[in-house]
Regions:
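Acidic anion/phosphate-binding donor-loop and adjacent secondary structure
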Residues: 25-33, 169-175, 214-238
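Conserved catalytic-core segment of nucleotide-activated headgroup transferases in glycan assembly
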Residues: 59-62, 186, 205, 220-297, ...
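Membrane-proximal helix-turn-helix segments that form the acceptor-binding/catalytic region
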Residues: 126-128, 175-193
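Acidic donor-binding loop of glycosyltransferase active sites
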Residues: 130, 311-324
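Donor nucleotide-sugar binding/catalytic pocket of nucleotide-sugar-dependent glycosyltransferases
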Residues: 188-227
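Short hydrophobic beta-strand element within catalytic cores of glycosyltransferases
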Residues: 338-342
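A charged, aromatic-enriched C-terminal amphipathic alpha-helix characteristic of glycosyltransferases
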Residues: 362, 376-413
Length: 414
């Protein structure tokens, strides 16, 4: 037996004796102890993966912002955390909401609460008119189980609202999680809200059918908008700088493909040494390329620094291996950078504005060649303000009104 095989054998033995995997459960799927609440008031429950401040950005922040829009109705609101345990010291503040640590039945009369149901077999009080707003796929899977229990207790299963922000089976290899995530798109009586028309087009093309479906277009982050309105018309000199969205921990952002294409480009372009390359998104060690070029890591930037960096840079790269458009390419293009991204089945975001080039069937050579085209061209870099995107005009308020009407929520009296 070779040393390599001996090590493999030893590893299997250690795994078997000390790290035996539990094949009878998936940690995100919960079995809640549902208890009856006789409170007759309607309530909408946000099912979320975390409410710890360090986690509340991107998709979680979008979900919370969408949920609080329902304050306009005369209903109770409850945030149920199903993923990470709540850390009180870093709880994300939601105006008017109170965190209930121990959840006795008396607290089911509170109108706006946050509760921690991250632990399996947690108790959960359910009303006859409880509705659920699911976010990540396993919150929808858990909601389905709760709704089945609601039907047994009260004789009626309420519709479920499902905010879909990506095609989540794609987060996994073909596996149990893949199948379970995909199954949530077939649950009965769903009101589905997509966070872009590109994502909705993908679901439509693949034959998914829902009771009702809506989509809203992304809008520019308010803080970025403020910087753009202050500085977007000024004559800022742009540097020979390439900025890309670098998140190696998220396979769908294709970090390796970008790095390999940058190395290929550095050999194609005889003036590549005149360019600086930066990665933003995750804290990384610098990556050395050939021709003595280095990808310098900026990590997670403040909004102000990110905005300033975009206004001073010429080229952006942001890939997303999913039907979700992602926000960095839209932001970079709005701030006047020439942006390279990828198409994906029904997604082609080059229609957003003329600063974006969406590459079909992207590979290392194609990305390197498109980058070479940009670094050797005489180009005017112009801030392009898509009015609805920059001014925050979206369909969200109309969608919330339509959902409220369908669920027979009454508007609050002014």
């Amino acid at each position: 037996m070779t040393i390599k095989n001996e090590i493999k054998h030893l590893k299997r033995k250690i795994d078997k004796n000390f790290f035996q995997k539990d094949y009878t459960s998936i940690s995100d799927i919960k079995d809640y102890q549902v208890k009856i609440s006789k409170n007759p008031r309607p309530r909408l429950n946000l099912l979320i993966t975390s409410m710890n401040s360090q986690d509340v950005y991107a998709g979680i922040k979008s979900a919370v912002d969408f949920f609080v829009k329902f304050k306009k109705f005369d209903i109770d609101l409850r945030i149920i955390v199903m993923g990470k345990r709540i850390d009180e010291s870093s709880l994300y503040p939601v105006p008017d909401f109170t965190f209930i640590k121990d959840y006795p039945i008396e607290n089911d009369n509170d109108s706006k609460i946050i509760c921690d149901s991250s632990k399996n077999c947690s108790s959960l009080f359910i009303r006859e008119r409880d509705y659920f707003l699911s976010t990540m796929w396993f919150t929808a899977y858990n909601a389905d189980s709760i709704l089945n229990k609601q039907e047994k207790l009260f004789g009626k299963r309420m519709p479920m609202v499902y905010l879909i922000q990506d095609y989540e089976p794609g987060f996994y290899p073909w596996s149990s999680e893949y199948l379970l995530a995909e199954s949530t798109y077939h649950l009965e009586n769903q009101l589905v809200v997509f966070n872009s028309r590109y994502l909705k087009d993908y679901f439509d093309k693949n034959g998914y059918v829902f009771e009702k479906s809506f989509y809203f277009d992304p809008v520019l982050n308010e803080n970025l908008r403020n910087v753009l309105n202050l500085n977007g018309n000024s004559n800022i000199e742009r540097k020979n700088r390439i900025l890309f969205y670098g998140r190696p921990s998220k396979a769908r952002n294709a970090f390796q493909l970008i790095c390999m294409a940058l190395e290929k480009w550095s050999l194609l372009d005889e003036n590549s040494s005149q360019w600086e390359i930066y990665s933003a998104g995750e804290d990384l060690k610098d990556v050395k390329l050939k021709n003595n070029l280095v990808i310098k890591s900026l990590g997670k930037m403040s909004v102000e620094n990110y905005a300033k960096f975009m206004l001073e840079s010429k080229i952006g790269i942001s890939l997303m291996v999913s039907p979700h458009p992602s926000y960095p390419p839209l932001e970079m293009a709005t701030f006047g950078m020439k942006v390279l991204t990828n198409s994906f089945v029904t997604k082609d975001i080059s229609d957003f504005n003329e600063n974006i080039k969406s590459i079909e069937h992207i590979n290392i050579n194609r990305l390197a060649e498109e980058l070479h085209r940009l670094t050797t061209a005489q180009t005017d870099y112009k801030v392009l303000k898509n009015d609805n995107y920059v001014n925050g005009v979206s369909q969200i308020d109309t969608i919330v009104d339509n959902i409220g009407l369908y669920l027979k929520f009454q508007k609050c009296e002014v």
